[in-house]
């Protein structure tokens, strides 16, 4: 029996050892954090942001947002409010409250309100300073273990003071969130925490459970209800009596919201924080309290210029009849790296982390999508050139789709350059139909445009998409056009460092070739035409080379436009500008005459001119493999083929065009040549005895000037035209019947003569006509 009990004991011991080992493994105890009092006692862990030159631009949730206060300065009724709301047995337990864990469920069920959680104030302080928000058994066990240790290292009052100075209370108005009770009192009541009333203290104790959900600014009714629950709990726990509780519950919220100092570059900073949260997989609270040093790509001068332009109402369309302002956004990227150098998310910046239209909206880009979808595919995949011809005529495609040009005018056979620079819808859709919508989709996606599976129709050629694009995404898609075909992801942040100096993130600087260098140049060169004389010609106001494209999206079932765009490129900078209403409808639409070529293009031009030191970098570099050639515009217009200009081609018809090596035209234009000499001139007398001359017309566009010489007098007596090979005849009715005359033909360039320029070929050899001798018919002469 003893032997049996011995083995049972051994078995139980082994099981206990194995169970303990399993528990240690499950809770990952060897990797638990150790208590670090420095994190609690030195809690100024602000996030610091730097610009592209490593100059500090903002300190978030740092000294100016958290104001430390000693516990003895906090009124007892305020301390009691936090104890009633968060940990009524705070001064009785040793870090964890075993009784409370069991009683919490009953208390919550009885009150119908989550008046208490299971975590003590000590545990909450540990979570705020040592742990993440991860919900796991290991994290909860660490929290309890560290709370027990903390209670041995710090007094209850020290723990409560640290908690009140660290906990987050949310934000108000245009300010960032308040950290610590002193900052919260200043934010919501414009007074020190030492002056808080019972009702005010209870409100602050109420909001920390969910600073956004119980925000007295955004959700005053919920905040009031939660405050009154805290006041009721104070009475139940004996901190105040029932009459005091009821009296305080009758008081209104009585907020006095502070106008917190406006931080500079608000839109840009918001974008940086959002990107940091995504890169590090952290919450906003963790970023703002973690002591991170965030190095951005901000160009402070460019951002300041953009902000100044957005403060001028004359730069934007008129508001709707009900006063709702038209909104706008701007993004500027470094062409080489994709770094965001400036960003504006709306007309006014009046709330931290509000809707950032530069990054968060998705709108139809309209014709602004054409260069990075249809034309990119045509040039890079199919070998189209700026001089290639496409038909600009109204067609009906599968499904009854019948796109039309703005204004209802069509131009027949046009070059790709003309179709893109003049934003001809019919020509663009016909081009997309030729090359195939799958190829168009492939190139749009290659340039970073996210498409839905439903975006597989010809309407995509005109920028009709299921989801739409943000100004940032559209600017990013244009990046390869300005950067020789290389794409890199647009980014705000260059590097993030932890408070201890560890590099948490470094932008990889990766680039990807999405277009050939030659294709990118041809595309941006065509967009230079759009910016100088086409739909985006307002960009020419910069005074330096710019390429660009506009976009206008109609309302559809109502009059007016819903979105207007301009994207502008220089060799160093890409700028995207959007304008429209946040919630477009029949009453909130831009007027029909307000398109992308207006306000957005002018704003983009002003912005680029303001940052000329950055944006002005001369011409886009002609890459190897591309050749410039002087071609005849008339031949392109009438013969629909690129032919070389001649020395006679008028300046207004001389076009500098670009061609890949091997595709440069070799033939010259037939329109601007010295006329050929007539070689078959004949002359005789007509039946009436008048000089009659005959010759063959040799070419189009030539005036054949008939020259007559009688004795010493030489004069032009007539001008004839004819088709090549046609026999031309002229009877000189004005000739004298008794004088000999000589006739010749002077070929004259018809078009040049009409333009005021005399260009002739060699005069033909003269032929003579003798008059009939009188009475010669009697003698057979």
Feature-to-residue mapping (PLM):
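Soluble, non-transmembrane domains of envelope/secretory-pathway proteins that act on or interact
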Residues: 1, 547, 551-781
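Juxtamembrane regions of bacterial inner-membrane/periplasmic proteins
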Residues: 2-311, 315, 339-340, 393
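A short, well-structured edge-of-sheet supersecondary motif
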Residues: 46-57, 74, 294, 323-351, ...
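Active-site SXXK
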Residues: 81-83, 234, 306, 337-338, ...
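Short, well-structured active-site flanking segments
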Residues: 91-101, 178-179, 241-246, 355, ...
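Conserved catalytic neighborhood of penicillin-recognizing serine enzymes
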Residues: 110-134, 191, 261-264, 383-440, ...
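A penicillin-recognizing enzyme superfamily signal
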Residues: 296-320, 330-332, 343, 350-359, ...
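Mid-domain, small-residue-enriched loop/turn segments at the edges of structured enzyme/sensor domains
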Residues: 401-405, 436-476, 489
């Amino acid at each position: 029996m003893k032997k049996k009990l011995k083995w049972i004991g051994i078995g139980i011991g082994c099981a206990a050892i194995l169970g303990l080992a399993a528990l240690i493994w499950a809770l990952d105890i060897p990797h638990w954090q150790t208590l670090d009092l420095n994190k609690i006692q030195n809690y100024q862990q602000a996030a610091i942001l730097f610009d592209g030159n490593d100059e500090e631009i903002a300190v978030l949730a740092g000294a100016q947002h958290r104001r430390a206060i000693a516990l003895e300065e906090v009124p007892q009724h305020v301390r009691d409010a936090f104890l009633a709301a968060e940990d009524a047995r705070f001064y009785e337990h040793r870090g964890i409250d075993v009784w409370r864990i069991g009683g919490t469920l009953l208390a919550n069920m009885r009150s119908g309100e989550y008046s208490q959680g299971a975590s003590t104030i000590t545990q909450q302080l540990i979570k705020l300073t040592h742990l993440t928000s991860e919900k796991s058994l290991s994290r909860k066990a660490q929290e309890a273990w560290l709370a027990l240790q903390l209670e041995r290292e710090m007094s209850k009052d020290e723990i409560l003071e640290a908690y009140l100075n660290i906990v987050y209370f949310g934000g108000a108005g245009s300010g960032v969130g308040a950290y610590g009770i002193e900052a919260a009192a200043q934010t919501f009541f414009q007074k020190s925490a030492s002056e808080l009333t019972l009702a005010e203290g209870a409100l602050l104790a109420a909001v920390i459970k969910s600073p956004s959900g119980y925000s007295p600014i955004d959700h005053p009714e919920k905040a009031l209800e939660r405050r009154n629950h805290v006041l009721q709990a104070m009475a139940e726990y004996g901190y105040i009596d029932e009459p005091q509780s009821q009296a305080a519950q009758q008081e209104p919220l009585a907020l006095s919201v502070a106008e917190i100092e406006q931080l500079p570059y608000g839109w840009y900073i918001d974008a940086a924080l959002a990107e940091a949260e995504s890169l590090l997989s952290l919450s906003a609270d963790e970023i703002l309290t973690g002591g991170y040093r965030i190095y951005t790509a901000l160009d402070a001068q460019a951002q300041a210029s953009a902000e100044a332009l957005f403060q001028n109402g004359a730069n934007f369309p008129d508001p709707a009849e009900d006063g709702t302002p038209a909104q706008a956004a701007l993004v500027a990227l470094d062409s080489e790296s994709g770094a965001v150098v400036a960003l504006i998310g709306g007309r006014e910046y009046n709330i931290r982390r509000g809707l950032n239209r530069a990054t968060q909206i998705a709108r139809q880009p309209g014709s602004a999508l054409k260069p990075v979808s249809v034309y990119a595919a045509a040039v890079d995949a199919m070998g189209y050139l700026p001089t290639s011809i496409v038909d600009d005529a109204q067609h009906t495609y599968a499904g009854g789709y019948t796109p039309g040009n703005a204004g209802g005018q069509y131009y027949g056979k046009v070059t790709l350059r003309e179709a893109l620079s003049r934003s001809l819808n019919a020509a663009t859709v016909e081009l997309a139909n030729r090359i195939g919508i799958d190829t168009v989709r492939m190139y749009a996606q290659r340039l970073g445009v996210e498409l839905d599976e439903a975006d597989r129709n010809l309407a995509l050629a005109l920028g009709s998409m299921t989801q739409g694009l943000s100004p940032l995404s559209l600017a990013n898609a244009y990046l390869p056009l300005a950067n020789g075909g290389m794409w890199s992801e647009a980014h705000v942040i260059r590097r993030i460092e932890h408070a201890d100096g560890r590099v948490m993130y470094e932008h990889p600087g990766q680039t990807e070739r999405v277009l050939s260098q030659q294709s990118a140049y041809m595309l941006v060169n065509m967009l230079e035409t759009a910016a100088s004389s086409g739909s985006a010609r307002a960009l020419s106001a910069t005074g330096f080379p710019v390429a660009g494209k506009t976009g206008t999206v109609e309302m559809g079932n109502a009059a007016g436009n819903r979105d207007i765009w301009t994207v502008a490129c220089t060799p160093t900078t890409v700028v995207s500008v959007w304008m429209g209403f946040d919630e477009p409808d029949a009453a909130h639409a831009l007027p029909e005459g307000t398109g992308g070529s207006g306000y957005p293009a002018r704003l983009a031009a002003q912005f680029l001119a303001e940052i000329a030191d950055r944006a002005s970098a001369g011409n886009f570099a002609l890459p190897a493999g591309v050749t410039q050639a002087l071609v005849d515009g008339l031949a392109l217009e009438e013969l629909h083929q690129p032919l070389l200009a001649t020395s006679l081609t008028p300046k207004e018809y001389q076009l500098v065009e670009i061609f890949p090596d091997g595709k440069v035209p070799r033939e010259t234009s037939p329109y601007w040549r010295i006329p050929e000499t007539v070689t078959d001139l004949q002359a005789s007398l007509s039946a009436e005895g008048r000089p009659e001359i005959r010759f063959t017309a040799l070419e189009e566009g030539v005036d054949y000037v008939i020259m007559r010489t009688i004795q010493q007098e030489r004069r032009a007596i007539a001008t004839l035209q004819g088709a090549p090979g046609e026999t031309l005849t002229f009877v000189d009715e004005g000739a004298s019947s008794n004088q000999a005359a000589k006739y010749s033909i002077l070929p004259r360039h018809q078009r040049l003569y009409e333009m005021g320029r005399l260009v002739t070929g060699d005069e033909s050899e003269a032929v003579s006509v003798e008059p009939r001798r009188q009475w010669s018919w009697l003698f057979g002469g």
